[in-house]
């Protein structure tokens, strides 16, 4: 797991076997799931080349006296919103893929709040919900999946978009405790989820029955939960991605030469 870092209060070798990699980097001899089960604190530190693109663009512009990053709020910039809504985002972090550019064009909003939603709903297992999101975004009628979910998913037009939505629905509809609901969220992101998912499914269906939810509705809601299979974002993750995307889109919209030079230099 190349991006995983384990943090311990004293030397890590006191807690787990350690070996040195060929490049001299110390590695624990447990895989990531075993490390978590063993009580070690594991965080993922992944590199993001787009941060270097933004850094180099800003440095070049500040050197020329054309820009200052102090108090910079790209989310409020109309030119940036226009570029995003038209899909003119090649070179911009996370929103340059064909799928994201097409979604930007269909959405046509270009605002930060919707980009946060779009950054999460674009996940592979949720493709079927993207057209429905666009329809509802443009004023299409919709109803809550169940009366018990009114005001739970209003922000996302009644669709489950973030990992937290799975937990919130499980609490509101099936009477899960918050720890049980978070356990379901975690299981959905694991490769070996089938080993425990059956128990969560049975508990979810049982809780829904006890609250009077029809089996057909429960099936629909569970199917939407399954769209979080393996790859999905929590809202803070999606918001942080959207923030970087907007910074890149701002620089491209206002300073395309310096921005693209930084993109090429960091390939």
Predicted regions and their residues:
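Noncatalytic, beta-rich nucleic-acid-contacting surfaces in large DNA/RNA-processing enzymes
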Residues: 2-267
């Amino acid at each position: 797991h190349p991006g995983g870092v384990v943090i311990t209060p004293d030397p890590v070798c006191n807690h787990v076997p350690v070996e040195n990699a060929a490049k001299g980097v110390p590695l624990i001899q447990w895989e990531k799931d075993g490390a978590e089960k063993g009580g070690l604190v594991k965080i993922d530190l992944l590199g993001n080349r787009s941060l270097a693109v933004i850094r180099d663009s800003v440095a070049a512009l500040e050197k020329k006296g054309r820009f200052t990053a102090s108090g910079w709020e790209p989310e409020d910039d109309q030119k940036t919103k226009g570029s995003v809504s038209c899909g003119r985002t090649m070179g911009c972090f996370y929103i340059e893929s064909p799928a994201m550019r097409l979604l930007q064009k269909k959405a046509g909003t270009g605002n930060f709040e919707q980009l946060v939603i779009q950054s999460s709903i674009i996940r592979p297992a949720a493709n079927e919900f993207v057209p429905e999101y666009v329809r509802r975004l443009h004023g299409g009628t919709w109803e809550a999946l169940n009366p018990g979910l009114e005001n739970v998913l209003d922000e996302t037009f009644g669709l489950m978009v973030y990992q937290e939505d799975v937990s919130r629905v499980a609490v509101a509809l099936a009477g899960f405790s918050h720890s049980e609901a978070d356990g379901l969220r975690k299981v959905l992101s694991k490769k070996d989820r089938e080993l425990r998912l059956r128990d969560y499914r049975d508990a979810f269906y049982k809780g829904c029955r006890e609250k009077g939810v029809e089996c057909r509705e429960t099936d629909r809601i569970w199917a939407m939960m399954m769209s979080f299979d393996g790859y999905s974002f929590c809202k803070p993750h999606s918001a942080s991605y959207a923030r970087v995307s907007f910074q890149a889109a701002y620089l491209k919209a206002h300073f395309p030469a310096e921005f693209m030079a930084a993109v090429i230099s960091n390939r």
